[in-house]
Amino acid sequence: MTRRVVLYIDSLKTGGAERVTLLLARWLSEDGWLATVVTRHGASRDFYPVPAGVQRIVEPSDPVWLRLFGPLGFPVRVRRLRAWLRRHQPDLVIGMTTLPAIKLLLACRGLGIPSIVSERNFPPLKRPGLPWRLLRRLTYPWAQLHLVQTQATGRWLAQHLKAQPQLLLANPVVWPLPRFSPDPDPNDWLASRHVRPQDQVLLAVGTKAHQKGFDRLAAMFELLSQRSPQLHLVILGLESVPYHGVDQQDQLRRLLPQASQQLHFPGRVGNVQDWYERADLFLLPSRYEGFPNVLLEAMASGCCCVSSDCPQGPAELIRDGVNGRLMANDASPAEWADVVSTLLADPELRGRLADAALDVRDRFSERRLRRCFMGGVSQLIGDD
C-alpha cells in the first residue's frame, strides 16, 4: 500500500523554507510516497513550481464569520485541519517553520500520526509572539522527530523546548541550480540600466531586508560608491510592493541618496545561478540565519563570497581566507568596505576563493543529504 505524507507550510512564496519543503516532497514522492503539500495561502503567492508527482492542496479559506474572530479563531482553524487529517489519514506529517508546525502538532494530537518538525531559523533570534512561544513549548515535545540545520539550533531546541529526537540535516545544494520563470538575462537587464559588461557588480539575495542586513550593506556601499562610481549593487528578491507594510526597496534607496543609479532591484528571479555568475562578489551581511541557502548556492556557483559570521550557518560553510571571507557579526561598514575593496582589486584572490568554494557541491550534495533524510524517515516509521 502506498504511504501518504503531508507537508504543511504557510505558502510557497520566495524563501528557503519553501524551497526545502518542495525538495523534501520530491524526495518522498520519488521514494514511492504519495506526497501532498498543504498550504494556508493559495497559488497567488506561489513562486516555486510544484515538482511532478507531488500534490498541492490549499486549505479552504476561512468563512466570513471565522475571519471576524481574527487570532481568537485559531482553535477553530486547528479543528478544521484536524478534520481534514482524519479524512485523508496520512501516514506521516511534516510541519515546516514554527507556526505551521505548532498548528499541525495540535491538529494531530491523539490521532496517532507520526510527526516531524522542521525549524528553519535560529529560534532565539526570531522570536514569535508570546502565545506562539507558549504553544511551541507545549507542542514541540510531541513531535517524533525534529529536523535541525545546525548543531547550535539543535542544542537550543533540546535545552529550551525538550525537542528530541533530532536529525541534523543541513540544506542541500541541488546542482545545477533549478531554473524557472521569471528568468531575465542579467547582462541584458543590467545593460538596460546602463551597467556596462566591464562594470563590477556586488550581489545580495533575500526577501527580508532587516534579517539579511541590507541596511548594513547600504552603509558599506555608501563608502565604496564614493571611491568607485562604476561599482553597482544588485539585490535580488526584494519586491516593489510593501512587505509587512514596509517598502523595503524605498527604504534602502533612502539610505543611498547619492548612489541611486548604482543600486538595482531586479525583484524575484528564477535563474539566480546566472546572476551569481555575473557578480564579482556575493555579500551576505545577515543578522541571523537558519542555514543560508543563498550563500550555499553562491558558493556552489563559483562566486567569491563574503558573509557575516552570524548565528547560524555561515561558519559551517566558509573557512575564512580559504573558500571565502567571514566577517565578525559586529563588523563596521568601514571594515566591510576594506575587505570588499581588497577583493575587488585582486581578481586572482577572488578566483582562488571562488574555486575553493566549489567544494560545497560535494559537502552538501543532494545525494548525501537525501540519503540522510530518507534514513531518518525509515527509522521513524519502522522500515529499518
Predicted regions and their residues:
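Short His-centered aromatic/hydrophobic patch
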Residues: 95-101, 119
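A conserved mid-protein helix/loop that constitutes part of the nucleotide-sugar donor-binding site
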Residues: 18-23, 200, 204-223, 334
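Short hydrophobic beta-strand element within catalytic cores of glycosyltransferases
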Residues: 304-308
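Acidic anion/phosphate-binding donor-loop and adjacent secondary structure
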Residues: 127-128, 155-159, 172-192
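N-terminal strand-loop element at the rim of the active site
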Residues: 7-15, 19-23, 27-69, 153-158, ...
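Short, structured helix-loop element that forms part of the nucleotide-activated donor/catalytic region
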Residues: 46-49, 232-261, 349
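Aromatic "clamp/platform" in nucleotide-sugar-dependent glycosyltransferases that forms part
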Residues: 268, 287
